[in-house]
Amino acid sequence: MHNMFPALTKTLSLQGYKIINSQTGSAAWSCGRRWFSSDKDDHDDVVTRIKISPIKRTNEPLDKKRARLIYQSRKRGILETDLLLSGFAAKYLKKMNEEELEEYDSLLNELDWDIYYWATKNFKTSPLPDKWANSKLLKQLQEFSENKEKEILSMPDLSKYQ
């Protein structure tokens, strides 16, 4: 691929994509969470998800869990999800019981864009898994994302989480 399509290789690398396995004659590149390949036919699923298993935390004190969830809500990597989850966490995290914290922790282990699309009810782009269909927490996040007060969202100050 590097020799066959130097302009494409340079363009993809400048945009943060990584070219892999160019010796096989097929092109494959990554944009972080999704892999694309040129050797699939029209009937194949072109996008394959990469999922990293979350760390199993046992006996984590609630104050440490809340602190970790605040950090994970604020530092997602995608601005839209950062703003949405950080505001949601600032408003609701301190009121959550242990079961709700576990559910929120599980939600944060999902892909950023999936969380964003589910929160904004864009199920055409990212279908909602059965696991989250009856989630009160996700419904609360969806209601929060409607921004009925029409506030301009920004990253909440850390004092808002107390």
Curated annotation (Swiss-Prot):
Residue range of the transit peptide in the UniProt record, numbered on this chain:
1-35
Q: Does the keyword Transit peptide apply?
A: yes
Could you name the Gene Ontology cellular component terms for this entry?
A: mitochondrial matrix
Entries under InterPro entries matching the protein: SDH (IPR005631), SDH_sf (IPR036714), SDHAF2 (IPR028882)
Which keywords accompany this UniProt record?
A: Chaperone, Mitochondrion, Transit peptide
Please report any disulfide bonds recorded for this protein chain, giving both cysteine positions: none
The family classification in the record reads: Belongs to the SDHAF2 family.
Q: What does this protein do?
A: Plays an essential role in the assembly of succinate dehydrogenase (SDH), an enzyme complex (also referred to as respiratory complex II) that is a component of both the tricarboxylic acid (TCA) cycle and the mitochondrial electron transport chain, and which couples the oxidation of succinate to fumarate with the reduction of ubiquinone (coenzyme Q) to ubiquinol. Required for flavinylation (covalent attachment of FAD) of the flavoprotein subunit of the SDH catalytic dimer.
Protein name, per record: Succinate dehydrogenase assembly factor 2, mitochondrial
What organism is listed for this UniProt entry?
Saccharomyces cerevisiae (strain YJM789) (Baker's yeast)
